[in-house]
């Protein structure tokens, strides 16, 4: 029994110790589980131990890397870490660290850029450095950044190994709370080296594409960047404390009604740096920024009227000569016996610069700066259709791109209160204030000036003007990149995305309007060209109607006996004159200068009320045609008739052949009817298939030249053409008036004979070979001309004849 009791006691003691050990182990596991991140579910002991082991391994790796990169020189205090020492050095040097790719994209910037230039790091990242530089410095900075990239692989690797320090000065844009303010640039100094980097995501380079071409870019595993320390050329004694390590820090104070310090909380010295006895009795306005004094005065008046309220965000000068952003809730306390105001109780809360900027821009109606000045300038010039003005708008937008496209703005330092020794950075000579770039104004007269300028150009030039597609120039320059601002609230991120999409939509709509306007302009220009062509054709028709018509009439003629026509065998003309009988009241229509008639090399013949007449000039043709009498005046037209029949009451007699009719007409003298001068045509050669230019030149020479008639009274025959004056009038013989229509149709199928006339050279040499026409009274000829001139001008109806070029296909006559 005793042994059993001893065993039970030992077992109970052992179980109790085991339970205690297990409980202690479970407590430790729970502590480890609570320290692990992301433990949303209950984990077993094995999982907790695995995660703890992984964390310890990573921690050891990081510690080893930190020890390797730790500064071991004596000039760094041992009690400061690398981050702390770097921050202190940057504050002492008035500088910040920046890493820029060879294309200009900013991949890293330190937080110290905010107190120096007023830009938040989130606003500068993924931007192009050229966005923050003046236009005149773009090319020079680009060459410096891409100098290492344009080398060969071996040269670039040697450049990274050696001491490749690069140092240059430039102007960098300052940030501002109000993006509509004129841009101000700070003169800074870059000192850095080219380094290789990896595991950095590719940036979007808002505002600029990568400046280095793809052929010169390094492979993804060997990327080069420029790491530099940026310093202000002129030291800035007053900086803004924009980065708040512990937000929502606050302290209290009491002020008199004149806003003098009466009390200061113990929490104030770590924030503002002043001890209570240092500020008691001093006015609170001595510590405020000069740009915020007006707003604070309004808040003070509001407080005196209503007894409580909340101030705007303002800058308070700390003991370390830095500006810290505060916001104050205040109220007035009254005396408990007489209810008179005693003092003002204030609760000051520290706010960050990012929150201040969001609040200020919301007050100004600018939640995000997604629409730049370039976009507004292009929208203002949307009504302009002139491609030159469109290019000017793009050039102006590119010139102000560095000043207006960046969304990162901040408030620059300004003159401070007079009780502290300060220097105003805004008034330093190293600042470069950009000129005011006014947006393009919309002009209503641009379209009118454009139309007037284009209408003044020749029609041929307008027809040959190619349309200038502005859409080819727009994709890279018309669409500014909208920037997403990193904000703590998801609502702000959504508003930024919505603003970006709205901006892109506006840009696309603007491009659509420009394309539609360009299409309308092209349609208007085409319509104007068609109207001008119609005007030219109408003017040619009016000129044709206004020219005087020639009436050729033959009357009171006695038919003589047929005379044989003597021809010289040795002189044979190369061109033949084909004559046809005419009736009184018939005219010859002038040659129209229309372009279509000239292109077709055709001529116009007129039709009278009783009969139709056509004259034909053939060169080397043996095709049988109807014999017609060709009479040339200053406005006589040349036409070629087809093989179709032509009927009229004045046809020739049945028993009389064509050869006899010609001899009857040419056997009589015409000296009484011949004027002193006539218009002659003096070309060297006339072909029935000649070109348009030669034909038009011959027509002008035919109307301009004048020659004197010979003493023998024979008509002037030039190159086979009989030239007569307007006053010359003839009629066919009386026997030809009795020819019936059926015989006229039969007569067309008879064999035609061509009357060969001499060239001008043979006419001048021998008078015996000249052709003689029937003589008529000049009074009768003139009377017939004047009687029928007015009638023929009203009855003149031009018709198009066949092309003269068809005669080239005719067989050659026998010589």
UniProtKB/Swiss-Prot annotation:
Activity regulation (UniProt): Carbon monoxide (CO) and the redox state of the cell can modulate the transcriptional activity of the NPAS2-BMAL1 heterodimer. NADH and NADPH enhance the DNA-binding activity of the heterodimer whereas CO binds the heme group in NPAS2 and inhibits the DNA-binding activity of the heterodimer.
Chain sites annotated for binding heme b: 119, 171
One Gene Ontology molecular-function label: DNA binding
Tissue: Expressed in the retinal photoreceptor cells (at protein level). Expressed in the pineal gland and retina.
Annotated bHLH domain residues: 9-59
Subcellular location field: Nucleus
Compositionally biased residues, Low complexity: 405-420, 633-655, 732-752, 787-815
Entry GO CC: CLOCK-BMAL transcription complex; cytoplasm; nucleus
Chain residue ranges for the region called Sufficient for heterodimer formation with BMAL1, E-box binding and for the effect of NADPH: 1-61
Coiled-coil residue windows: none
Compositional bias (Basic and acidic residues): 1-10
Domain spans labelled PAC: 311-354
Co-factor(s): heme
Entry keyword set: Activator, Biological rhythms, DNA-binding, Heme, Iron, Metal-binding, Nucleus, Repeat, Transcription, Transcription regulation
SUPFAM superfamilies registered for this protein in UniProt: HLH, helix-loop-helix DNA-binding domain (SSF47459), PYP-like sensor domain (PAS domain) (SSF55785)
InterPro entries: bHLH_dom, CLOCK-like, HLH_DNA-bd_sf, Nuc_translocat, PAC, PAS, PAS-like_dom_sf, PAS_fold
Residue ranges constituting the PAS domain according to the UniProt record: 82-152, 237-307
Induction comment: Exhibits a circadian rhythm in the retina with peak levels in early subjective night. No circadian rhythm pattern in the pineal gland.
Biased segments, Polar residues type: 425-462, 588-608, 616-630, 753-786
GO biological process, one term: circadian regulation of gene expression
Positions of the UniProt region annotated as Disordered: 1-21, 405-467, 584-656, 728-815
Function as written in the Swiss-Prot or TrEMBL entry: Transcriptional activator which forms a core component of the circadian clock. The circadian clock, an internal time-keeping system, regulates various physiological processes through the generation of approximately 24 hour circadian rhythms in gene expression, which are translated into rhythms in metabolism and behavior. It is derived from the Latin roots 'circa' (about) and 'diem' (day) and acts as an important regulator of a wide array of physiological functions including metabolism, sleep, body temperature, blood pressure, endocrine, immune, cardiovascular, and renal function.
Subunit structure, as described in the record: Component of the circadian clock oscillator which includes the CRY proteins, CLOCK or NPAS2, BMAL1 or BMAL2, CSNK1D and/or CSNK1E, TIMELESS and the PER proteins. Efficient DNA binding requires dimerization with another bHLH protein. Forms a heterodimer with BMAL1 and this heterodimerization is required for E-box-dependent transactivation.
Protein name according to UniProt: Neuronal PAS domain-containing protein 2
Protein source organism: Gallus gallus
């Amino acid at each position: 029994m005793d042994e059993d009791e001893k065993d039970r006691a030992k077992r109970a003691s052992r179980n109790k110790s085991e339970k205690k050990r297990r409980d202690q182990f479970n407590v430790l596991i729970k502590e480890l589980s609570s320290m692990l991140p992301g433990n949303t579910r209950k984990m077993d002991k094995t999982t907790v131990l695995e995660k703890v082991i992984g964390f310890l391994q990573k921690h050891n790796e990081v510690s080893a890397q930190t020890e390797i990169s730790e500064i071991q020189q004596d000039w760094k205090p041992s009690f400061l870490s690398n981050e702390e020492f770097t921050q202190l050095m940057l504050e002492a040097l008035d500088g910040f660290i920046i890493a820029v790719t060879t294309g200009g994209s900013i991949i890293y910037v330190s937080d110290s850029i905010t107190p120096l230039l007023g830009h938040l790091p989130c606003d500068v990242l993924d931007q192009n450095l050229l966005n923050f530089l003046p236009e005149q410095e773009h090319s020079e900075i680009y060459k410096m950044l891409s100098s290492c990239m344009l080398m060969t692989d071996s040269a670039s690797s040697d450049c990274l190994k050696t001491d490749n320090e690069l140092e240059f000065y430039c102007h960098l844009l300052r940030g501002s709370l109000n993006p509509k303010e004129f841009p101000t640039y700070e003169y800074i100094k870059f000192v850095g080296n080219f380094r290789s980097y990896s595991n950095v995501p590719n940036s979007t380079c808002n505002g600029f594409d990568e400046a280095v071409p793809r052929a010169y870019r390094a492979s993804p595993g060997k990327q080069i960047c420029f790491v530099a320390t940026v310093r202000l050329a002129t030291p800035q004694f007053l900086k803004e404390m924009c980065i708040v390590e512990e937000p929502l820090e606050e302290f209290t104070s009491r002020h008199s009604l004149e806003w003098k310090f009466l009390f200061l909380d113990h929490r104030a010295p770590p924030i503002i740096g002043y001890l209570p006895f240092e500020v008691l009795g001093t006015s609170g306005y001595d510590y405020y920024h000069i740009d915020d004094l007006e707003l604070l005065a309004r808040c003070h008046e509001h407080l005196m009227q209503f007894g409580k309220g909340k101030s705007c965000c303002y800058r308070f000068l700390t003991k370390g000569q830095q500006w810290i952003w505060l916001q104050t809730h205040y109220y007035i306390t009254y005396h408990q016996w007489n209810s008179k105001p005693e003092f003002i109780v204030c609760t000051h809360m520290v706010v960050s610069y990012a929150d201040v900027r969001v609040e200020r821009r919301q007050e100004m109606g600018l939640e995000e700066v997604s629409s730049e000045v370039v976009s507004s300038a292009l929208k203002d010039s949307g009504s302009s259709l002139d491609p030159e003005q469109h290019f000017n708008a793009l050039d102006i937008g590119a010139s102000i791109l560095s000043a207006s496209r960046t969304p990162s703005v901040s408030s620059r330092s300004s003159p401070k209160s007079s009780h502290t020794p300060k220097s105003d950075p805004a008034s330093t000579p190293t600042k470069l204030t950009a000129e005011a770039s006014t947006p393009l104004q919309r002009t209503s007269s641009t379209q009118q000036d454009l139309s007037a300028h284009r209408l003044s150009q020749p029609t041929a030039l307008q027809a040959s003007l190619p349309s200038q597609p502005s859409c080819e120039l727009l994709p890279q320059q018309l669409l500014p990149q909208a920037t997403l601002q990193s904000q703590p609230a998801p609502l702000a991120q959504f508003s930024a995305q919505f603003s970006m999409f709205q901006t892109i939509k506006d840009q696309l709509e603007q491009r659509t309007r420009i394309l539609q306007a360009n299409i309308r302009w092209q349609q208007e220009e085409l319509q104007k060209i068609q109207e001008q062509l119609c005007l030219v054709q109408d003017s040619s028709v009016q000129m044709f109607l206004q020219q005087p018509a020639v009436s050729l009439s033959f009357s009171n003629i006695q038919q003589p006996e047929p005379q044989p026509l003597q021809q010289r065998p040795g002189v044979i003309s190369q061109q033949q004159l084909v004559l046809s009988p005419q009736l009184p009241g018939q005219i010859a229509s002038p040659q129209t200068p229309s372009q279509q008639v000239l292109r077709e090399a055709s001529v116009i013949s007129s039709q009278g009320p009783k009969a139709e007449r056509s004259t034909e000039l053939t060169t080397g043709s043996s095709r049988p045609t109807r014999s017609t009498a060709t009479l040339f005046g200053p406005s006589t037209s040349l036409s070629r008739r087809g093989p179709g029949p032509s009927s009229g009451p004045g046809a020739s007699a049945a028993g009389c052949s064509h050869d006899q009719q010609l001899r009857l007409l040419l056997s009589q003298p015409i000296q009484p009817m011949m004027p002193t001068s006539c218009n002659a045509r003096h070309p060297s050669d006339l072909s029935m298939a000649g070109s348009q230019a030669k034909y038009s030149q011959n027509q002008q020479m035919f109307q301009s030249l004048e020659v004197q008639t010979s003493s023998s009274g024979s008509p002037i025959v030039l190159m086979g053409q009989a030239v007569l004056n307007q006053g010359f009038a003839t009629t066919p013989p009386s026997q030809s008036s009795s020819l019936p229509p059926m015989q006229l149709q039969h007569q067309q199928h008879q064999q035609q004979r061509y009357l060969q006339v001499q060239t001008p050279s043979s006419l001048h040499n021998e008078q015996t070979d000249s052709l003689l026409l029937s003589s008529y009274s000049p009074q009768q000829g003139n009377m017939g001309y004047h009687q029928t001139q007015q009638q023929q001008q009203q009855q003149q109806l031009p018709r198009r004849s066949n092309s003269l070029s068809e005669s080239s296909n005719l067989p050659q006559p026998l010589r």
